[in-house]
């Protein structure tokens, strides 16, 4: 694993082998950053500079979190997790990458199974980190500004 300068790794946070954590990142309590040793072609988790990863969030399987993005508590990101940007008039879906300065919370999407319809986890991009949350105030404010408890 590589953890760059100025990064804060809080209590019970883990960073797996081969993960790359940028400068001035905040890994909150209980965060799990996955690592990969094999297969050789597997992509590492990359958390870019200035990102804030909320309590108990899990990021694995080659996911990349963009510069200054904010992941709320309990967000789970794998290579197959649906990431849905709900900030525009129509949702935009992607996988594996959180754009810079995005504010992300856990969500669910309906899926039909033989026993009925159930919600499966996804990640929702609910806005962009505002300048008011940069360095002057707690990054938790990025979530509070969007009405999300932290």
Roles of regions detected by a PLM:
Residues 1-112:
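Structural signal for interior beta-strand "rungs" in well-ordered beta-sheet cores
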Residues 95, 100-102, 106-150:
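Terminal amphipathic alpha-helical/low-complexity segments used for targeting or macromolecular assembly
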């Amino acid at each position: 694993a590589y953890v760059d300068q100025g990064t804060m790794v809080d209590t019970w946070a883990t960073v797996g082998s081969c993960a790359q954590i940028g400068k001035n990142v905040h890994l909150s309590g209980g965060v799990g950053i996955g690592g990969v040793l094999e297969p050789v072609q597997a992509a590492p988790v990359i958390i870019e500079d200035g990102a804030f990863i909320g309590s108990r969030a899990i990021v694995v399987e080659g996911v990349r979190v963009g510069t200054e993005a904010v992941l709320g508590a309990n967000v789970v990101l794998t290579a197959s997790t649906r990431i849905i940007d709900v900030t525009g008039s129509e949702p935009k879906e992607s996988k594996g990458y959180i754009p810079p300065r995005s504010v992300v919370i856990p969500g669910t999407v309906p899926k039909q199974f033989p026993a009925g319809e159930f919600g499966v986890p996804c990640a929702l991009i609910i806005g962009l980190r505002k300048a008011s949350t940069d360095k002057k105030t707690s990054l938790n404010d990025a979530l509070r500004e969007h009405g999300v408890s932290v």
